[in-house]
Amino acid sequence: MERVNDSALNRLLTPLMRRVRLMLARAVVNVINDGRKVQNLQVGLLDDEESDEVERLQNYGHFSVPLPGAEALIACVGAQRDQGIAVVVEDRRYRPTNLEPGDAGIYHHEGHRIRLTKDGRCIITCKTVEVYADESMTVDTPRTTFTGDVEIQKGLGVKGKSQFDSNITAPDAIINGKSTDKHIHRGDSGGTTGPMQ
């Protein structure tokens, strides 16, 4: 068997190694186009190389729009730099740190987040929570605590007992079909009582 010298082997392997090196690249996100069916990125690669129309594939049911300056891992199909796909986009500037093993969640660069932790806890941290439901909403829990004021803008139906440890303020209360504001009854010395004062 004839021995291949090192320089001949290097000449054979160099083009192959170059293509392997071109298959994956680190990149910095410059521009995001979220108006298409598949999100497109313009990214800066190594050595001042820019790549437009890089498709960013996201898991079904999940979405995000990265900020300029986020980092990406680009896979180039067939080692062709014009066939890039962003397989991972991360932003170390805003990623929550010092989490516990097993924690998972969603975060936003402004600081609000949903965090799933051990012992079945879901912690939502934000300024405002808005829930829009076309039909109904059910909260099924043995106990609910509100630590601030609660405002109900429409009717309230209570099927269980109610306990109040402070005053109730209302223009009128209807109890057993009778108005506490306009209710009168016979007085103990004849006549009728006036409305409640």
Swiss-Prot record:
Please tell me where chloride binds in this chain.
Answer: 188
- Chief subcellular location equals virion
Give the GO molecular function terms: metal ion binding
Induction is noted as: Expressed in the late phase of the viral replicative cycle. Expression of late genes is activated by the viral late transcription activator C.
Q: Does the keyword Calcium apply?
A: yes
Tell me one GO biological process term: viral tail assembly
What residues does Fe cation bind to? 183, 185
Q: How is the cofactor bound?
A: Binds 1 Ca(2+) cation per trimer. Ca(2+) plays an important role in interaction with the host cell membrane.
Tell me, according to the record, the phenotype of the null mutant: No tail is synthesized.
Q: Which UniProt keywords apply?
A: Calcium, Chloride, Host cytoplasm, Iron, Late protein, Metal-binding, Viral baseplate protein, Viral contractile tail ejection system, Viral genome ejection through host cell envelope, Viral penetration into host cytoplasm, Viral release from host cell, Viral tail assembly, Viral tail protein, Virion, Virus entry into host cell
Cofactor(s) needed, names only, are: Ca(2+); chloride; Fe cation
Free-text domain note: The C-terminus is a needlelike shaped homotrimer consisting of an intertwined beta-sheet, a triple beta-helix and a metal-binding region.
Describe its assembly. Homotrimer. Part of a complex composed of three DNA circularization protein N, three baseplate hub protein gp44 and three sub-complex wedge (made of two copies of each baseplate protein gp46, gp47 and gp48) that forms the baseplate.
Record's protein name: Baseplate puncturing device gp45
Say which species the protein is native to. Escherichia phage Mu (Bacteriophage Mu)
- Upper lineage: Viruses, Duplodnaviria, Heunggongvirae, Uroviricota, Caudoviricetes
